[in-house]
């Protein structure tokens, strides 16, 4: 097997993306998504060939400065072959000498082999879960797979006249962010910065890899969702709701999203990941229950951190604390 590393100006987008779509279909492994990997980092495109054919691809990021950088992956490679992953990490370490590897993202990564992470030296491993709805089913079967309470809420929202629409421009991104700010203030959570959404929109909108959807009632936004997608798979990235929204508006929103994506020919709708362990009554419990009631297959996934150079990692942690 031969492993090669390319930078963004060296990779052939059509060929890279075609292989991603033929395998994992993960939208965060497409070349367009790498446009978000900037600032103090840059994307690297790792591919492995055997007998003249590509058998493995992985888009990752190098963060930091020369001689003091770390490796980060937002999502899984195209397969979980232990030999390929070991070769990929070995090749990256030889070229860039990262002091650690951070491979963990609740929203986008779907790596299912905990044993492989342990074999590669990941000492801090996180477990999480996600439910994925198969859109290749009939619309009737998809609706039957939704929990009865969600179905009743969807019907109620329809009777109340809740409407569904897709955002078309940056003004809708602003509209989404305004609602998300209110959501996080209400739940005492921490929202991501507005420029994260604007940059994601600018990088991914033209290629159709990011979309914003809304549910409104009497011209007032009730609920919104941000979807990151490929032609095969859509992932629910972020959501926002109005305080005291019309009953069922959020349920209705995701049902309409699933129907639209099915009509467009997508195969899967991923409701995004959540931690597996939480205390009863925690707000995470309500979020998990809301997602799981849309049906689909619930699976466990893993991520974590592997330290290659302990003293550099200690310095890095101290630096973060100072900031």
Where are these regions (language model features)?
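A conserved beta-strand-loop-helix scaffold within acyl/acetyltransferase catalytic domains
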Residues: 3-51, 55-66, 111-126, 138, ...
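Residues at or immediately flanking beta-strands
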Residues: 103, 161-163, 268
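Non-catalytic accessory segments adjacent to catalytic cores
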Residues: 83-129
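Aromatic (often tryptophan-rich) hydrophobic motifs at membrane interfaces
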Residues: 57-58, 65-70, 76-79, 83-98, ...
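Active-site/acyl-donor-binding loops of N-acyltransferases
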Residues: 2, 35-36, 43-45, 62-65, ...
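Beta-hairpin (beta-strand-turn-beta-strand) motif
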Residues: 74-78, 106-109, 134-136
């Amino acid at each position: 097997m031969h492993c090669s590393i390319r930078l963004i100006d060296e990779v052939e987008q059509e060929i890279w993306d075609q292989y991603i779509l033929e395998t994992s279909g993960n939208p965060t492994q497409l070349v367009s998504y790498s446009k978000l990997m900037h600032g103090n980092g840059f994307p690297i495109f790792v591919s492995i060939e055997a007998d003249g054919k590509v058998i493995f691809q992985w888009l990752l990021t190098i963060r930091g400065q020369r001689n003091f950088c770390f490796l980060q992956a937002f999502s899984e490679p195209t397969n979980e072959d232990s030999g390929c992953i070991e070769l990929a990490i070995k090749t990256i370490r030889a070229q860039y000498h990262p002091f650690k590897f951070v491979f963990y993202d609740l929203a986008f990564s779907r790596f299912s082999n905990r044993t492989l992470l342990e074999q590669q030296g990941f000492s801090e491993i996180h477990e999480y879960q996600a439910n994925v709805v198969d859109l290749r089913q009939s619309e009737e079967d998809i609706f039957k797979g939704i929990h009865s309470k969600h179905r009743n809420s969807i019907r109620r929202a329809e009777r109340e006249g809740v409407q569904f629409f897709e955002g078309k421009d940056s003004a809708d991104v602003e509209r989404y962010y305004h609602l998300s700010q209110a959501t996080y203030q209400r739940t005492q959570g921490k929202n991501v910065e507005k420029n994260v959404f604007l940059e994601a929109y600018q990088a991914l909108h033209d290629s159709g890899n990011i979309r914003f959807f809304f549910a409104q009632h009497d011209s007032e936004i009730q609920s919104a969702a941000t979807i990151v997608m490929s032609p095969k798979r859509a992932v629910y990235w972020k959501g926002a709701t109005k305080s005291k929204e019309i009953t069922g508006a959020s349920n209705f929103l995701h049902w309409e999203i699933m129907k639209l994506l099915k009509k467009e020919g997508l195969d899967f709708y991923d409701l995004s990941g959540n931690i597996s362990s939480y205390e009863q009554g925690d707000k995470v419990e309500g979020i998990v229950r809301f997602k799981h009631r849309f049906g689909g297959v619930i699976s466990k996934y893993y991520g974590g951190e592997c330290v290659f150079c302990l003293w550099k990692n200690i310095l890095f942690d101290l630096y973060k604390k100072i900031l």
